[in-house]
Amino acid sequence: MNSWTGLSEQAAIKSRQEHGANFLPEKKATPFWLLFLQQFKSLVVILLLLASLLSFVVAIVSGLRSNWNFNHDLIIEWVQPFIILLTVFANSLIGSIQEFKAQKSASALKSLTKSFTRVFRNGELISINVSEVVVGDIIFVDAGDIIPADGKLLQVNNLRCLESFLTGESTPVDKTIDSNEKATILEQTNLVFSGAQVVYGSGVFQVEAVGIKTQVGKIAKTVDDSVTKLSPLQQKLEKIGKWFSWFGLGLFAVVFLVQTALLGFDNFTNNWSIALIGAIALVVAIIPEGLVTFINVIFALSVQKLTKQKAIIKYLSVIETLGSVQIICTDKTGTLTQNQMKVVDHFCFNSTTQTDLARALCLCNNASISKDANKTGDPTEIALLEWKDRSQLDLKTYYRVYEKAFDSIRKLMTVVVQKDNRFIVIVKGAPDVLLPLCNNVQNEVKNIENLLDQSAGQGLRTLAVALKVLYKFDQNDQKQIDELENNLEFLGFVSLQDPPRKESKEAILACKKANITPIMITGDHLKTATVIAKELGILTLDNQAVLGSELDEKKILDYRVFARVTPQQKLAIVSAWKEAGFTVSVTGDGVNDAPALIKSDVGCCMGITGVDIAKDASDLIISDDNFATIVNGIEEGRKTFLTCKRVLLNLFLTSIAGTVVVLLGLFILGQVFKTNLLQQGHDFQVFSPTQLLIINLFVHGFPAVALAVQPVKEKLMVGSFSTKNLFYNRQGFDLIWQSLFLSFLTLLFYSLGIIYAINNRDLQTSGDLINRAGSTCGFFILGASAALNSLNLMVDKPLLMTNPWFFKLVWIGSLASILVFLLIIFINPLGLVFNVLQDLTNHPVLISYSFGGVILYMGMNEVVKLIRLGYGNI
């Protein structure tokens, strides 16, 4: 190595000021308080806050009107706005906590800040932190080092760099100091790039770009500029939430005005507050308050499950998008294969033994494996070391005295090793180059070439080895050096392959059963890619494989294997499938993969081999670099969507039924029972806002969690799975008739409760007690029926014909919700707050009405299922 002066400390400081420091700026994390405030941008939340504010106004007016006599009516009026506020804040807190956790898991550590490199400063070779490297520095690197910045080579000594993270090429690149002006920047062999790994030799280069201005940094900027993707379900929920909000706001105004007019203007101060409370109850009934919260909880539980299965989800929404994936564009090396070259076959010529062949390949080798299994060097040479038990090869008795390094022109590597008084010349390299240099194969060349063709036909890489013995060697004798690679004795060859993972074939088969199309995109050779793709079942026809250089963008959808692909071509492939309307997942581990990872619907980065920028660009990180893990994620995504849909159906059931009950109650039953209630000094109200909040939160809360953790019985990975429609296969029809039937039962038993109270001596003297009697029946029927409806959604068969143990968690969740209602209606202090009749045990008729309504609702569902079962519609 020549002596280089390098920069002075003053020059380094000046360079840093002019060109910047050598690190990639991290994207600033959104603080928790801002995440919390962002939850209040939702129109649903704004409407609930407005309802809370108006409830406060009503409470204040009522307080002024009663001279602040805090009877139980006024207490309830003051409790209601606080409960609405508590609901809003709880929802927002849960949402912000989940986003904050996802944000923390998404922040990848920048490995550059922890690395050191060797640099010439003031004529001395010193070690500095990579972040301190500046433009103009002269850097020395050798095998095992990571290139710290982009630069131009000044000196090389058999330097080979692995740049697959940037170019997609899995073979190390031979570096020179000669430039090629016609080549692209990434193809310039006299340039080195930040993040590349030196696998062989050594070199000296001068830094030309650092930090964000390197090739890595330019791609990193596209990652920082990317936006968070919404899942298909989140997009639908955003629209549904807006629809509910505007519909609720419109009905609020209409109901308030009509109710005020119906109540009359004689006692306007009192009547407008009654109308306002009714309108607020309607808004609370319409809006499914738990919509976002329950979906986030389900997503979070699924994310935790996948984390244990080696899939780290960065954003909650990704889990559901996974379930809708139709195309998986996957790398070959390390994802479908083991990312570890292995000797899978060998040929020993004449009397050569496996031990002889293995010993020669280990001696002509510059890789190393330490006692703690730390591997350094070219992956192919490492595979040769791992082929046989080296302890049996007696390698320590051989001493290397000379090496003629491998280069891409000769395609050979030669070493001279000494044992006792013998000098053994060992030559390793390409079989087609090595065979003509051997003098013992003249009559067997054709047979050997046939064997080599068979290996090539299987997509295997072959390496041949030969040797000769000298009894005198002088490395200063140029004539002897020139003759080293002639008159050799052929020993044989080995065939190497990065073999497929055992689980990859099963995962590909699972994809095809699920109508998911796997696409292989690789920087490797077409023949190698084709063999692996056929073995795994990705490729069925030879004309479905194409080289990147021969790719016609109009025919992208016709191919299943793409070989020798550039990053731009990979991006074009992903874009073509997306433009055709497919949901696309992409795997990658290098900087060059970042644009495609961002473009895809679900970007999957390899956790072991993936670089930080690829991890930043991805939506989930596969910590075991295994294709099967992605397939597991898709299955979990499908289950998550199914669970979310069941929760949404239940939420919409109570929203629709609650809205119908409040509307018809106000305008029909309100007129029917108006006289009875007003004569006893009480306004008409089927449900209070607090009752509706309890139904929308507690009724669905326990079953929602239970649905998330309950194993599904459906075969989710058989056939296509669409997340485009929330309701299909008569689910929309069922939702309508169930909601209307539940509304009818609620209004019916509310009316029966009112009639019972009117005719009961203990209750008929108080309008408040009369209203509470009816409200108690309706409250329990609507809530308990919705809780048990979670079980209806689990199976198409009647519940009486299924084993309860299959859905034990949902049973537990539903019964827990019913227990909440029982506590409310039977514990007097709770009943007072939630507007139900106290001392209910004294009124068994009302208890029978409450349970009777629930039994009728569940019974009707069982009858409908039996009818369908009889007609073969299930």
From Swiss-Prot:
GO terms for biological process: monoatomic ion transmembrane transport. Pfam families: Cation_ATPase_C, Cation_ATPase_N, E1-E2_ATPase, Hydrolase. One of its GO terms (molecular function) is ATP binding. Mg(2+) binds at D589, D593. The chain crosses the membrane at residues 42-62, 80-100, 238-257, 276-293, 645-664, 688-708, 727-749, 771-790, 804-826, 845-865. It comes from the Bacteria. Its EC number is 7.2.2.-. It is found in: Cell membrane. It is an enzyme of class 7 (translocase). It is a multi-pass membrane protein. The keyword Translocase applies. Its main location: membrane. This is Probable cation-transporting P-type ATPase. It comes from Mycoplasma genitalium (strain ATCC 33530 / DSM 19775 / NCTC 10195 / G37) (Mycoplasmoides genitalium).
